[in-house]
């Protein structure tokens, strides 16, 4: 398995403070030289424009728009990981919502799909022991498709999530 991963066409660039222009240039180069199947930006709030801006919210909005244009230009899906604001902390129901996307309402507008991760057992004072070891993928936006919640198993010691085991005896 490790041999397959070593030979896989995966390119990781963990350069700090990448600008949108640098990301666009690298995406074009990789597509031309190796082919490109997916772009992942981890995470959006670490991006910088390299210039003075009026507000961070405007800057993040511009990144959101530029990433959408980049995905269309290079014709591949683009996943942009984003932090949430502290909205859930002030609510009784701690489940994240679209409005909790940090620093920009345009993230919600530009995205074709928004998935939020929620771990009920990670909340202080969690009483939902029946859900221990589970998490939810909340499909909060899906342009042209259904929205809803998908329960999954958390396997945090392996830094992964998996399908829940199904009961074939019911």
What are these regions (language model features)?
Residues 54-59, 96-99:
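Alpha-helix N-cap and loop-to-helix initiation/capping positions
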Residues 81-83:
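Conserved H-loop
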Residues 20-38, 65-75, 86-170:
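C-terminal regions of RecA-like/P-loop NTPase motor modules
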Residues 1-55, 62, 89-90:
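Conserved inter-motif catalytic segment of the P-loop NTP-binding fold
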């Amino acid at each position: 398995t490790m041999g397959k991963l070593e030979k896989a066409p995966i390119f990781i660039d963990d350069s700090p403070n990448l600008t949108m222009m640098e990301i666009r240039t690298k995406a074009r180069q990789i597509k031309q030289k190796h082919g490109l199947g997916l772009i992942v930006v981890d995470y959006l709030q670490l991006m910088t424009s390299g210039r003075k801006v009026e507000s961070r919210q405007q800057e993040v909005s511009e990144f959101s728009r530029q990433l959408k244009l980049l995905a269309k230009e290079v014709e591949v899906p683009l996943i942009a990981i984003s932090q949430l604001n502290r909205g859930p902390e002030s609510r009784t129901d701690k489940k994240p919502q679209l409005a909790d996307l940090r620093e920009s309402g345009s993230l919600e507008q530009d995205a074709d799909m928004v998935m939020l991760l929620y771990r009920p057992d990670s909340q202080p004072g969690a009483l939902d022991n029946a859900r221990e070891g589970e998490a939810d993928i909340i499909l909060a936006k899906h342009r042209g498709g259904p929205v809803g919640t998908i329960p999954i198993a958390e396997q945090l010691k392996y830094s992964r999530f998996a399908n829940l085991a199904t009961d074939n005896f019911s």
